[in-house]
A protein has these predicted regions:
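Membrane-embedded helix-loop-helix hairpins and adjacent transmembrane boundary segments
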Residues: 1-494
Length: 494
């Protein structure tokens, strides 16, 4: 009992600190007058992110339970090869901001875009594109949040010894409350704190593993004795074939350009200098976190052998090597990764309902029909309701948790990748191409996953994006040419 209390103290202090930031963010939203002013503040923080905050917001939104629990768990099983594979994720911030950042930000300011759907509306001038994007975002985000809620509660349960329901209650209600109260500004500031917690936690547990193992050389000798395959790029038992590496490059490499939760951050930074510094800081942060946590998993097998379930590797290693108080500080790291993913998705779900659907199609962009007080109440209510729905769904966790998360992220990429990228850089891109690509991409992703059909040994995301791109290009070329649209030229600088 004493150990539990000692473990909970740093966690509770951390949660209270986050709630304080949310209350400060809430005060900022009250300072904004007018419907548009409130929505820009609540959903985008008035485009005020500096470089460090922007870097942390992108990286912490991208990283999740898999970065701290799932990935290191696989590294525990297959060895150093998985660390090499995880490094594919290092350019996340550099790629997102380098390819999308400045162009996205300029267009967003010209069109007053607050969400990714606002951008799609301005680019394609199609209600079908907007509605498809909003529905896909809501469905896949809620599925992904469900997986994150369950992952957070199970992590809490495995380390503290409290029940799954208690973990879900503490974790779930905390993230729902601070996101609902504080909006985007609270989200990015808590993401910054959570990014720092992730760095500290990953460093602490790696030092503990190396110390307990008697140094890196000794640990490597132990891994060699367990299975020489643990030290090879192909992994134990040749479990990392080349087609899988290609698939990983697509899914967590350039495929991230199709994830709305990361591209949304491109709309909110302050200036070009902030973007450039974020590219450097973000690249270092994700590289350091991925390297340290996956090293913990791979090296941990020599220090704490015999863990049968990969997902239990990090919690078990933490409990074996750290005191209750420091274990409590460590758990804040992966919980921070999960919370920072959920909070961004919550705020974007609220924006999709209030800004993209209700304000545009019901209020017809008329601020008199949606005055500041009403939009404030509606935004806070929708954020809270979406969070509570996911919370109750997580009370009885489904057994197919891995598939839910896979469908969510792959589904988002299949829907948003082509309309976003082609919309920014290809003059001929039009609504027909976007509609066909979104529907065909989503259908293809589900087909390849359900049928288990593999193309040249790759996973579903590779043929899915090829099909989505081919359909987008064909649909755009075979339909009306809008390249001479004067308004389009003015907005997109073609």
């Amino acid at each position: 009992m004493t150990n539990r209390i000692e473990m909970m103290i740093p966690l509770l202090l951390y949660f209270f600190f986050i709630m304080g930031i949310a209350l400060w963010g809430n005060k900022k939203t009250k300072d904004k007058t007018g419907t548009s002013g409130f929505m820009e503040e609540y959903f985008l923080g008035s485009r005020s992110m500096g470089g460090f905050v922007l870097a942390m917001a992108i990286i912490t939104t991208y990283t999740s339970a898999s970065s701290f629990i799932g990935g290191p768990g696989v590294a525990y099983k297959v060895g150093l090869g998985w660390i090499l594979l995880s490094m594919i994720q290092v350019p996340t911030a550099f790629l997102t901001l380098g390819v999308l950042g400045k162009r996205f930000a300029v267009i967003a300011r010209r069109t007053n875009a607050v969400t990714i759907t606002d951008f799609l509306r301005a680019r394609y001038k199609s209600d079908a594109v907007v509605i498809l994007a909003s529905l896909a975002l809501l469905i896949f985000f809620m599925a992904s949040m469900l997986a994150q809620f369950i992952g957070g509660a199970r992590l809490f349960e495995s380390i503290t010894g409290y029940s799954y329901q208690m973990g879900l209650l503490i974790f779930g209600l905390t993230v729902i409350m601070y996101t609902t109260i504080g909006g985007f500004r609270a989200v990015v500031l808590t993401d910054t704190i959570q990014g720092i917690m992730m760095l500290l936690a990953s460093t602490a547990i790696l030092v503990a593993v190396i110390t307990a193992g008697g140094g890196v050389a000794n640990i490597m000798s132990s891994l060699q004795a367990i299975d020489p395959g643990l030290l090879t790029p192909q992994g134990a038992g040749g479990s990392i074939p080349k087609p899988f590496i290609l698939s990983f490059w697509v899914l967590v490499g350039f495929g991230i350009l199709g994830l709305p939760q990361t591209t949304q951050k491109c709309l909110g930074f302050k200036d070009t200098k902030s973007m450039q510094s974020a590219m450097i800081i973000g690249t270092f942060t994700v590289g350091f976190t991925m390297l340290t946590m996956h090293l913990v998993g791979a090296l941990g097998r020599a220090v704490v052998p015999g863990i049968e379930i990969g997902d239990l590797a990090i919690p078990t290693i933490t409990l074996k090597l750290m005191s209750p108080f420091w274990a409590g500080i460590f758990i804040a790291g992966p919980l921070a990764a999960i919370m920072s993913t959920v909070d961004s998705m919550l705020i974007m779900c609220s924006a999709a309902i209030v800004k993209d659907l209700y304000f545009h199609y019901v209020a017809r962009n008329d601020e008199t029909k949606l005055p500041p007080r009403k939009v404030r109440l509606m935004s806070l209510s929708v954020t809270g309701i979406v969070g509570v729905l996911v919370f109750f769904a997580a009370m009885e966790p489904p057994s197919l948790l891995v598939w839910i998360n896979l469908f969510a992220f792959g589904g988002l990429e299949s829907v948003f990748f082509c309309p976003t990228l082609f919309g920014l850089y290809w003059r001929r891109a039009n609504a027909m191409g976007a509609i066909l690509s979104m529907t065909a991409g989503c259908a293809a992703f589900f087909f390849f996953n359900i049928s288990k059909i593999s193309v040249a040994g790759t996973t579903a995301i590779v043929p899915t994006l090829v099909i989505a791109a081919a359909v987008f290009i064909a649909g755009s070329l075979l339909s009306k040419d809008n390249t001479n649209d004067a308004e389009l030229h003015k907005i997109f600088d073609f």
